[in-house]
């Protein structure tokens, strides 16, 4: 017999009167035309900091095309194992003005090409055991803290520019001051409510040229930056740099 409590799975052997406790690391993947429908190229979404195994929120920033033949699906494993879900398998909510979801032959698609922050909420319930809500938000990335002059809010003056295509880089404004770099997304619903939670629950940095997400971990090692430098992020390749 197995039960899940929070982030742990407990397996009980009644016959031998033993038990085993194993930490569970729930995941979510996105596959579609933008990943060539190849699970080896699928985007692994980032878990919010306070997820549990049965309920949680996951996010990623990705570029997708518009309409038919540009669809995508999600799954909790990187495989065609029957757990994947598309247009009919989730509640779809757009928080982007003028952008709507469309049915691409059972796949999820949007009616305007571009960069989006995709947010998937997994909730225990429903006929299959889980319900899913797929959200889209504008892909807002912010500089927080010392390097923007000490601000700890969603300041539009400290928002990254968004590239025109899938190969481009998100670029920060020139940093205002020397200090520890803090980067995050902080998606808000159409009603202005925090979708994930506080900014640190969806923060990230980069090390050795690779974007590294905090996810469910603790404080990350610090990256120090100089005034005048800019941050460059490529969410397609996962590469990043500071110069």
Specify the residue positions occupied by each region the protein language model found:
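Insoluble glucan recognition modules
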Residues: 1-243
